[in-house]
């Protein structure tokens, strides 16, 4: 009786922290146990057995995001060696559809949280800025599966996108002015008016039994 009460209290606490329902938490817990091999924590190598990740060109960045202390709200840099179920839920909550019944301020806060998660995937050195080199790395990874696009072409695409970002965020630049990279404030400007919902989903975890959209 006491154990059952304690478990339900824990679920309610997780509901409050992540926004998932008790049914969703139960289903995600089954998936967590499947990934971890029934262990209390997950390590990076546990993601090697996720079929939907195998062919994803930015697989390494997706997996890394699960262990990024910034996303886990445990610090401003560094990676965790392993994550527990609550950590797993924290990361999964970034992919949860925004509840549009919330107030405007809360909806905007949820959107910013999602964009911060994406920003961290680009900002690999945790310095608060996406440099040209970091952006090139992402574009090269994204296009690595396309045999018709050479590395130099991928770099040109990244360079062009960075120039466009500079024009959006800084405006007209002087000939000798150097754009040092995209800050999170810049990132918000770039994503203004873009539907973040269509860019972030959880199919890569192959959760065929889970319906996160109601």
From Swiss-Prot:
InterPro entries in UniProt: CHP3, EF-hand-dom_pair, EF_Hand_1_Ca_BS, EF_hand_dom
Chain intervals for the UniProt region annotation (Disordered): 1-20
Free-text disruption phenotype from the record: According PubMed:22285131, mice show a normal number of megakaryocytes and platelets.
Domain spans labelled EF-hand: 110-145
Family annotation (Pfam families): EF-hand_6 (PF13405)
Residues that, per the record, bind Ca(2+): 123, 125, 127, 129, 134
Lipidation residue positions, type N-myristoyl glycine: 2
GO BP terms, alphabetized: cellular response to retinoic acid; intracellular sodium ion homeostasis; male gonad development; megakaryocyte differentiation; negative regulation of cell population proliferation; positive regulation of DNA-templated transcription; positive regulation of gene expression; positive regulation of granulocyte differentiation
Basic and acidic residues biased stretches: 7-16
Topological category with respect to the lipid bilayer: Lipid-anchor
GO cellular component: cytoplasm; cytosol; lamellipodium; nucleoplasm; nucleus; plasma membrane; ruffle; ruffle membrane
Location of the protein in the cell: Nucleus; Cytoplasm; Membrane; Cell membrane
A GO MF term: calcium ion binding
Annotated keywords: Calcium, Cell membrane, Cell projection, Cytoplasm, Differentiation, Disulfide bond, Lipoprotein, Membrane, Metal-binding, Myristate, Nucleus, Protein kinase inhibitor, Protein transport, Transport
Record note on what altering residue 123 to A does: Abolishes calcium-binding. Does not alter subcellular localization and does not prevent inhibition of calcineurin activity
Function: Functions as an integral cofactor in cell pH regulation by controlling plasma membrane-type Na(+)/H(+) exchange activity. Promotes the maturation, transport, cell surface stability and exchange activity of SLC9A1/NHE1 at the plasma membrane. Promotes the induction of hematopoietic stem cell differentiation toward megakaryocytic lineage. Essential for the coupling of ERK cascade activation with the expression of ETS family genes in megakaryocytic differentiation. Also involved in granulocytic differentiation in a ERK-dependent manner. Inhibits the phosphatase activity of calcineurin.
Family: Belongs to the calcineurin regulatory subunit family. CHP subfamily.
Domain-level remarks: Binds calcium via its EF-hands. Calcium-binding mediates a conformational change. Can also bind magnesium.
Subunit architecture: Monomer. Homodimer; disulfide-linked. Interacts with SLC9A1/NHE1; the interaction enables an optimal Na(+)/H(+) exchange activity.
Name the UniProt record assigns to this protein: Calcineurin B homologous protein 3
